[in-house]
C-alpha cells in the first residue's frame, strides 16, 4: 500500500510533523541512544585517540579502529556542522561564466583612436627606462660618469663652524 495514499496527501504535500526533505540541504540526526556512544567517544578521545571511525561502533577498542575511518563531526545539538551539509552546485555553470564579460577588441581600438599617447611616445619612454644614461650624457661626449646614477654621499659637507665667545661657558663646569 502506498504511504501517501494511506495518509490522504498528494505527492507534493507534507504534513507539519514530517522532517524536511534531504533536498533542503540539511541533515536530521537521531539522538536516541547516542549519549552512551558519545560518552565512549569522548573517553576514547581523552585517552589519546585522534578520531572516532564512522563505520566502526564507538565501543570497539584498539588501534585498528582509529586508523580505518573518521567520524562525522556534529555540534552539541546533533546537527551537522555547516561545512558538512549536502553538496550543491559549488560554482556557476560554464555558460554563465562565459556571459559575464564579452570583450570586443574592435570597440576598444575605436575608443583608443583619440588617445593622446601613441606608440612612438610609449616606445620612447621604454628606451629611456632601459638606457637611463642616454638622457644624462652630454650630446657630444658619450663617456659614462658613474656619479649620474648614484645617490649623493651620506656624509654631508659641513661648512666651518664659528662659535661665539661665551657660548659654551656653562659646559665647562
UniProtKB/Swiss-Prot annotation:
Residues covered by region (Disordered): 1-70
Gene Ontology molecular function, alphabetical: histone binding
Gene Ontology terms: biological process: blastocyst hatching; chromatin remodeling; muscle organ development
Taxonomic superkingdom: Eukaryota
Subcellular location: Nucleus
Main location as per UniProt: nucleus
Summary of subunit composition and partner proteins: Interacts with PRMT5. Interacts with histone H4; specifically interacts with the N-terminus of histone H4 but not with histone H3. Interacts with CBFB. Found in a complex with PRMT5, RUNX1 and CBFB.
Protein name: Coordinator of PRMT5 and differentiation stimulator
Source organism (scientific name): Mus musculus (Mouse)
The gene coding this protein: Coprs
Amino acid at each position: 500500500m502506498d504511504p501517501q495514499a494511506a495518509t490522504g496527501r498528494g505527492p507534493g504535500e507534507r504534513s507539519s510533523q514530517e522532517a524536511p526533505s534531504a533536498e533542503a540541504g540539511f541533515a536530521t540526526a537521531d539522538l536516541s541512544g547516542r549519549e552512551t556512544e558519545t560518552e565512549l567517544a569522548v573517553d576514547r578521545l581523552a585517552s589519546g585517540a585522534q578520531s572516532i571511525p564512522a563505520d566502526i561502533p564507538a565501543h570497539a577498542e584498539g588501534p585498528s579502529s582509529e586508523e580505518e575511518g573518521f567520524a562525522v563531526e556534529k555540534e552539541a545539538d546533533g546537527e551537522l556542522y555547516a561545512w558538512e551539509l549536502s553538496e550543491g552546485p559549488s560554482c556557476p555553470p560554464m555558460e554563465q561564466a562565459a556571459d559575464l564579460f564579452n570583450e570586443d577588441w574592435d570597440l576598444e581600438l575605436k575608443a583608443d583612436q583619440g588617445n593622446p599617447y601613441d606608440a612612438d611616445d610609449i616606445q620612447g619612454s621604454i628606451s629611456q627606462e632601459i638606457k637611463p644614461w642616454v638622457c644624462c650624457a652630454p650630446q657630444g661626449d658619450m663617456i659614462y660618469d658613474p656619479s649620474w646614477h648614484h645617490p649623493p654621499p651620506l656624509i654631508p659637507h659641513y661648512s666651518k663652524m664659528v662659535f661665539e665667545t661665551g657660548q659654551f661657558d656653562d659646559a665647562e663646569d
